[in-house]
Amino acid sequence: MSKQQQTQFINPETPGYVGFANLPNQVHRKSVKKGFEFTLMVVGESGLGKSTLINSLFLTDLYPERVIPGAAEKIERTVQIEASTVEIEERGVKLRLTVVDTPGYGDAINCRDCFKTIICYIDEQFERYLHDESGLNRRHIIDNRVHCCFYFISPFGHGLKPLDVAFMKAIHNKVNIVPVIAKADTLTLKERERLKKRILDEIEEHNIKIYHLPDAESDEDEDFKEQTRLLKASIPFSVVGSNQLIEAKGKKVRGRLYPWGVVEVENPEHNDFLKLRTMLITHMQDLQEVTQDLHYENFRSERLKRGGRKVENEDMNKDQILLEKEAELRRMQEMIARMQAQMQLQLQGGDGDSGVHGQHV
């Protein structure tokens, strides 16, 4: 056997080495070849810069034909669901990113109806995945379940509005919520910290379940542990988005130009944009796992229970019909038996009358 042929196999002369230590590399290659899927929902009132932030996060334009509605249109406007999918490739790794936007949220006078549209969409994706998972061909299931929801909070209030509380409580058992303070450049650093604390206190007060970053494993390096600690401390993330390149300190940066200076989007000293993007990228797998193991399983269990109750009710109805038919048969049999008994009595009575008359004669 030639040397080239021998190199195709695990070297038998390596003591104590079987070769399954290479399995993670196989999984990695397979995952890279298949690509990744992720669905991000963005919810918040109009004018908070949601579209700009999403374009900034992924360096792409997901809304090239978006038209901003006027004030008159907003009054009559109902919430819509707009899903945009884009294929992003970076260093050979493909990501199929779907961003679900909800234009019209919070614009109507009665905002309760907008909850139903968004909740129905989340449930529909669960229902579709359950249907595909239960089918015969399960090799190419497209996962459109909502893995994460960026909920945008206005920086102009003093915390959460009643609408914010009601909506987050309505969806927190269905999707991973990441609270985001929009337009952080309208706040001073002290105002930003006060608003963050106020929002966290209100989230705890109202028992709202937001996405909690998992603790770093003990065997992780110190840099990753410190990164995890900083990300946790930054929730809710206060962000600035911009698609404009401006010159600052002799270099081109994405940011916003003001008379008093420049706010750089990707400067961690100016806002939490980089932290938000780092959180999303480094915890994308965990967000998918929580969606699968917690939110989807809860939906699936409830759905199967409802289906089970439906089947049980159908069985009960069938049993009831059988019992009614059996009762009807018994009534008919009893009626026939009574008729036969009456006929028998009549026959016996006729014979008796003949015997009596014969004695008198």
From Swiss-Prot:
Location in or out of the cell: Cytoplasm; Cytoplasm, Cytoskeleton; Cytoplasm, Cytoskeleton, Spindle; Chromosome, Centromere, Kinetochore
Keyword GTP-binding listed: yes
Key words of the record: Acetylation, Cell cycle, Cell division, Cell membrane, Cell projection, Centromere, Chromosome, Cilium, Cytoplasm, Cytoskeleton, Differentiation, Flagellum, GTP-binding, Kinetochore, Membrane, Mitosis, Nucleotide-binding, Phosphoprotein, Spermatogenesis
Domain Septin-type G: 34-306
Modification type Phosphotyrosine: residues: Y17, Y211
Site (Important for dimerization): F156
Region of interest called G4 motif, as start-end residue ranges on this chain: 182-185
Residues binding GTP, per UniProt: 44-51, 78, 104, 183-191, 241, 256
Coarse class of the protein's main subcellular location: cytoplasm
InterPro entries (alphabetical): G_SEPTIN_dom, P-loop_NTPase, Septin, Septin2
Summary of subunit composition and partner proteins: Septins polymerize into heterooligomeric protein complexes that form filaments, and associate with cellular membranes, actin filaments and microtubules. GTPase activity is required for filament formation. Filaments are assembled from asymmetrical heterotrimers, composed of SEPTIN2, SEPTIN6 and SEPTIN7 that associate head-to-head to form a hexameric unit. Interaction between SEPTIN2 and SEPTIN7 seems indirect. Interacts with SEPTIN5. Interaction with SEPTIN4 not detected. Interacts with SEPTIN9.
General function of this protein: Filament-forming cytoskeletal GTPase. Forms a filamentous structure with SEPTIN12, SEPTIN6, SEPTIN2 and probably SEPTIN4 at the sperm annulus which is required for the structural integrity and motility of the sperm tail during postmeiotic differentiation. Required for normal organization of the actin cytoskeleton. Plays a role in the biogenesis of polarized columnar-shaped epithelium by maintaining polyglutamylated microtubules, thus facilitating efficient vesicle transport, and by impeding MAP4 binding to tubulin. Required for the progression through mitosis.
Full protein name: Septin-2
Protein species of origin: Bos taurus
Gene from which this protein is expressed: SEPTIN2
